[in-house]
Every structure is written in C-alpha cells, then in structure tokens.
Amino acid sequence: MAARTWRAVRPLISRHASRWNCGHGRFIATDSRNRLSRFWTPTGLVEADLKAQDAQQKDAKPNAPKDHSYSFLARAGYLRQVQSGIFHLLPLGLRVQNKLEALIDKHMSSVAAAKVALSSISTEALWKKSGRYSANSELLRVKDRRDSGFLLAPTHEEEITAMVAASIKSYKDLPIRLYQIGRKYRDERRPRNGLLRAKEFVMKDLYTFDYTHENALETYEAVRSAYNNLFDELNIPYTVAQADSGNMGGKLSHEYHFIHHSGEDKIWSCDGCEYVANEELVQHKTEEKPSDHVMVYTAISADHKTRINIHVGMPGAKDQYNTFVWDQHLNPHAIRSAVEALEVELATGLEQDTLAHLVSNTTNTVNVYDIRLRSQLDSAEADKASHDLEAILPGDTCPKCEKGHLTPAPGIEVGHTFHLGTRYSKPLNAVVATPENAEKVAVHMGCHGIGVSRLIGAAAALLHDEKGLNWPRAIAPFEVILMAAPGVPEEEVAEVYDTLSGAGVDVVLDDRTGKSLGWKLKDADLIGYPVVAILGKAWKTERKVEVQCRRLGVKGELMAEYQDGLTKFLGRL
C-alpha cells in the first residue's frame, strides 16, 4: 500500500523506477527510460546571447536576410555561445551531434574507412614543408615555453600524410582510407550565423591513399557515392556542385550544399540539364561579340612587384586604361585563375588609393586577355587569352547543354570532396616502391570533409518555421516525444512508451512536473521533435493516441494502432 500511495503522489513512475532529489530540487527518475526530467533542457529566450549574435550578423553583412536558426538553437536549449564564434553544446545538442556522427560512421564503413583520432595540435614545420603555413592567414598559431611553433589545426592533411608516410613502403600497403571526427579551429575574422561560421567547429575528414591516379579516381567516386547515400538518408534537400579546389590542391572537387538565403556561396544551375557549379568554377557559353574597344583593368601581384593588366572587350565603350575599380562585368575567380596560369599570385582586398600607389612602384608587367580578344592578338599574346573573364549573369547560356540558362542560388556548404593527387605526398615524402622495384613514386591522395557542427546549423536554418526547429528523423535528438494529459495513469503511459521503444522508436517521455500540457506542446514545437504523441481525451475514451507532425502537416490525427502508424510517419521523415 505504501508503494502504491508513493506512486500516486509522484506520477509517471513505472516499474523498476525510482526518483531522487537533492534537497528541495526537482525529482529525477532513474529508470532506463528516456525522460526529460533527467535531461537538462534550459529552453527559453537568452536575450544577451541572441543580441550579441544579431550584432555580429549585422556587422558582417548589414543587408543580408536575417537567419533565425541560431536563435532557435539557443532558445531550444541546444547550445550556448561563450564568445564570438565559440559555443558550448548542451545535452540536446550533443544528442544531435552524436546521431550525425553515427550516421557518418555508418557510411564511412561502406567505403572500408578506419576511424582515427589525430591531435588538434599540429607542428609549424609540417605546414611549412607543405607550403600552406605562410599562405593561410586564418591559422590559430601558438608557441610553447620553449618557443616552439604549433597551430590548432583547421585540417589534417599534413599530419596524416606524415603519419602514413612513416608506415608505408610498397604499393602493396595501399589503399589506405582513414577518417576522423573532431574539433577544428580557424581564426575567423568575422564569425557569424551561429554554427555556420565559427572559430571552433566539428568536422569529419576522410583521407585516402592510392597507388595510381586511376585507383585514386575510383576511390573518389566510391566516396562520392557514400556521400550521396548519407545525404539521401539525412532527407534534407541538397545540391552537388562542381567546385574549385582552392589552396587544397588538385583539380577534381565537388561541394555539397543546402540551398538557403543565409548561404555565403553562390551556386549556379542550368534549367535545361544537370549542370551545377559553384561561383569559382562556373562557366557560360562564350558568345562571340564585336569588341571594337578595350577596357584595361589594373591589379597587382601579392608580392607587389608585378603590375597585372587585364584586357576585356567592351562593345560600344571607349578605350579606357588604368582602371583600378573592377565592375560587375568581370569574373574575379576567372581572373585569378588566368593570373595563376602565368605563375603570378593576385593580391586582393586592396583599397583603390593603395593599389594605385603600389602599382606605380612595380618592376614587372604581365598582360591577361579575355578569350574574345584572341583573334585581335598576335600569336605570342594570343596564348594569354585562354580564359573567359566576363562575369556570369543570370540567364547566360549553359556551357554544357548550350540550350538551358543559368540561375544562381545561395548555398550553405556542408560537405566537400577533393582529389588531391600528389599535392601533399610529394613534399611530405609519402612514397612507395613500384612492382618493378623502380624509383619510388608519390601516392595519390584524396580529402573528403563534412562539416558536422555546420551541418547541424544548416539543418536548423533550412527546416525551422515560426514555431521552432523541425529536425529530420536521422539526427533529431529523439524521434518521438510522448506526453500525457493529467489523469492518465502512469502505467498506461509506461505501456505506450515501452511499446514504441520495443518497436525501435527513439522515444522520450516528457514527465516534467509543474508544466501544463499546453506548455509542453509549445516546448516540443520549439525543440523540433519529428513526431509528438499525446495521451489525452481520445486516449481516455477510445484508447487512441493523438499524433502531430509539423513537417508532414499532420495535426491531431488519432491512432488506435499507434505503433504501426508512428512507424509509417517516421519512415517519411
């Protein structure tokens, strides 16, 4: 009788359960069921935190559309901001991250990748050997008491290449596929948009090592297939774009994007075929135009020694020279590629007056020509007219099908695949003996990343509505939240919970005391559980569970066979 009386006073305590409290604090169940009474879920508005984040976004991009995803993540109790670009994950946020990492582990296993954990501290020496140390201004550099130089690694190409190089001797030791999921660091000048651009972030990076170029390309396609399967299972619309490798090296690269107004990348797609490319790599069909007049823009090399004259045909314009301000007619990415082809690095971000002063002191001059000027040049200069320097504009003709038209859209990059070739293996001496025992050859590498914390922020940006977050099933903190109206016996709530859990549903019970059913429903919307299951009036009278699912537009559906019904709902999420 005493036990029965105690359970009546403390509702929603099932068999094999107990509760304890510290002093006069909240009671916490200690059974094996997932209960919100056992989670720290500090939901609610965090004014100071959100105002600081809004100020950062306004400072970085004053006219950009406001992104509410970070405010929902903070209000729903997923994270807290410590400083600009630095965040603490709370229990709900960690569950989302753990689920995403488990999904990544599953698909990395499909390409026979082994998991490692490299140190976040890398040595300056390796980065100097690869040539990336001086070229990267966003490295977080540190020194120890002996004045030895280190850095907090943003990526691990150097470290993992050196480690593998010390362990391989023959082509028979290959292929090798190693990946890790860990914290990375970048000295972001303007952190913004919450998890989308932070100083500390979690990333999955896979590194592949193959004997031949052909083997490396086969590996690249296998990883791309695994990525497609991963993003398909995630069930969030995504776009794969051809991309430029940048300072990572290599020529083959693809990016995975969520299309959203808060994205900082511009993704171009054709309305007539499957052509998709990012703004660094996008091309359009080169249209021949009469170019009676030439506009010459002026730039300078990164070492300030070389003047760069950029010649572009301007139909209907007057000849004009020494123009320091580039306009919307130029493609800065194409210009950078054209200049790099001449083995000159382009300086960017200089003010007009500064550029004009520096150019007056240069000792060398190189000329770059738009491809449309080729017919007007002598043979020596025509070789320098190999790039289309005109800006890509909406409606331009697709270079692939030559029929469709190009349209831009903002994208959030959440994944990237690189074929690196021998970019790192050569300088770091990752070589193997060949079958003929001839001179050793450098191995061919690939690097494939997924921004784990960024993907969490991107999913929140893409799927939230005015009520709150709206997680896909694969990474939701829980798939179903179960709650009961006052008066529903705890044994019946436990029975429904156990039935769902036994069917493989990841369910959590909202057993928090002192909160009304209406408050719990609003809190569930804010947190973003895929499915809300309610034991209310219909349960008391008809033994039916009320189900809500915002992502599918379902509200108030009653289910007698709730186990099968909920499983079908989740299958669509």
Q: Can you say where each PLM-predicted feature lies in the sequence?
A:
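NTP/phosphate- and nucleic-acid-binding module
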Residues: 2-573
